[in-house]
Amino acid sequence: MQDPNADTEWNDILRKKGILPPKESLKELEEEEEGKEEQRLQQSVVKTYEDMTLEELQENEDEFSEEDERAIEMYRQQRLAEWKATQLRNKFGEVLEISGKDYVQEVTKAGEGLWVVLHLYKQGIPLCSLINHHLSGLARKFPDVKFIKAISTTCIPNYPDRNLPTVFVYREGDIKAQFIGPLVFGGMNLTIDELEWKLSESGAIKTELEENPKKAIKDVLLSSVRDPVPMRRDSDSEDD
């Protein structure tokens, strides 16, 4: 097929008759090609700086044009905001000890969207010590959740020891779940996975456990009851 932009006598006649559109000027073609090339370069730059860390952006900033600098600065601010949000979410990682006077600041005013797990305990109660140990592991595993503990009577005067251990789960100052007394926790057989599952049911943490670990233990026990180990028959010991 003949190129309608070709500079031929026949094409000139067709243009005069209005059969062919006016020929694109060389300048227009060059501008169009330059625009496409600039777009390709910009896309290349975007792909480059989107893969960079904040430190790498700073090291390579002299290599970008003025237009790129504006785009990169916007991207830098976005990355910085994301980094700050991550640091805010991951600012805990341990169980904090508080007293009653700290309650309002550490629980009620803990922060928007923040989950708080409070363990009321007393020294000398073995199950309280076990739960404190488990909570330390969970605090490291879920650093975006605020885990705190307090001696019970410093927060609630005359709080009965029979209610210990007690765990309250809060979100934005409101109680979302409460676990009161040793029976709720299953006694000293409580595992860290079982405690993680309990807290996940309240919404405080996002567990990767697929089912209640206590259920698995029950299934094993029930299976052993249904299918007892057969008694050994020592038939060879009795000879006529």
Swiss-Prot record:
GO molecular function terms noted in the UniProt entry: protein folding chaperone; vascular endothelial growth factor receptor 2 binding
Residues where N-acetylmethionine is found: 1
A Pfam family: Phosducin
Domain Phosducin intervals: 27-181
Region called Disordered, residue ranges: 21-42
SUPFAM superfamilies: Thioredoxin-like
GO cellular component, one term: perinuclear region of cytoplasm
GO biological process: actin cytoskeleton organization; angiogenesis; apoptotic process; cellular response to heat; chaperone-mediated protein folding; negative regulation of chaperone-mediated protein folding; negative regulation of ubiquitin-dependent protein catabolic process; positive regulation of angiogenesis
Free-text description of this protein's post-translational modifications in UniProt: N-terminal methionine acetylation destabilizes the protein.
Function: Acts as a chaperone for the angiogenic VEGF receptor KDR/VEGFR2, increasing its abundance by inhibiting its ubiquitination and degradation. Inhibits the folding activity of the chaperonin-containing T-complex (CCT) which leads to inhibition of cytoskeletal actin folding. Acts as a chaperone during heat shock alongside HSP90 and HSP40/70 chaperone complexes. Modulates the activation of caspases during apoptosis.
Subunit relationships: Interacts (via thioredoxin fold region) with KDR/VEGFR2 (via juxtamembrane domain). Forms ternary complexes with the chaperonin CCT complex and actin substrate, leading to inhibition of actin folding. Interacts with XIAP (via BIR 3 and RING domain). Interacts with HSP90AA1 and HSP90AB1.
Protein's UniProt name: Phosducin-like protein 3
Origin species: Rattus norvegicus
Gene encoding the protein: Pdcl3
